[in-house]
């Protein structure tokens, strides 16, 4: 259930229409027997992201909320914000409070540049979220009409992941756009060793 990134600069429907659309999609997925709903690309919270997450949570199945953070300055200041100015810590606090978000089982940071991830994960924990925490960043830059990637050393990525785990008890890790199979292979080996399993 992707949350309208393509509508970033366009016109949004009336809130009740937008909410009804999210609820309809959530119910259709629930009726189809999905095990969980991942609400991705939540780069805005106050007007739209909150509606999408509440609708997903109303379906009565586990929900993962996947926040995308682009603001380098606020991350460097240890107070990361979404694009609407909402602090990541505030979002975590609201999700941790239960209520209409009681079926939210995990919060993730995704589609976010690697150097920004640590501040975001720490902010989620500061917000009082004690449940599962995940991170799957992207890598590269979109230059019309396609993505451009520079090399990402697998060892560097694994080093970042180990810090997520140690500092923030991050238990769900992976990669988004631009994190290729070789990097994921190295991550898989690290995860097996970390979890005490033999590497195949």
Predicted regions and their residues:
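Domain-level signal for soluble alpha/beta catalytic cores
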Residues: 1-200
């Amino acid at each position: 259930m992707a949350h309208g990134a393509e509508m970033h600069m366009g016109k949004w429907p009336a809130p009740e229409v937008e909410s009804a659309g999210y609820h309809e999609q959530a119910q259709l997925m629930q009726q189809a027997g999905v095990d969980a709903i991942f609400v991705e690309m939540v780069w805005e919270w106050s007007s739209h992201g909150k509606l999408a997450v509440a609708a997903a949570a109303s379906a009565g199945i586990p929900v993962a909320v996947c926040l995308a953070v682009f603001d380098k300055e606020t991350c460097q200041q240890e107070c990361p914000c979404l694009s609407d100015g909402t602090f990541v810590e505030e979002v975590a606090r609201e999700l941790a409070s239960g209520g209409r978000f009681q079926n939210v089982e995990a919060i993730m940071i995704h589609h976010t540049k690697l150097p920004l991830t640590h501040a975001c994960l720490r902010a989620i924990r500061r917000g009082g979220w004690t449940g599962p925490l995940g991170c799957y960043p992207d890598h590269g830059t979109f230059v019309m009409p396609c993505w451009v990637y520079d090399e990402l050393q697998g060892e560097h990525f694994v080093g970042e992941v180990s810090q997520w785990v140690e500092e923030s008890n991050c238990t769900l890790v992976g990669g988004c756009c631009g994190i290729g199979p070789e990097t994921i292979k190295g991550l898989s080996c690290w995860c097996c060793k970390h979890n005490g399993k033999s590497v195949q």
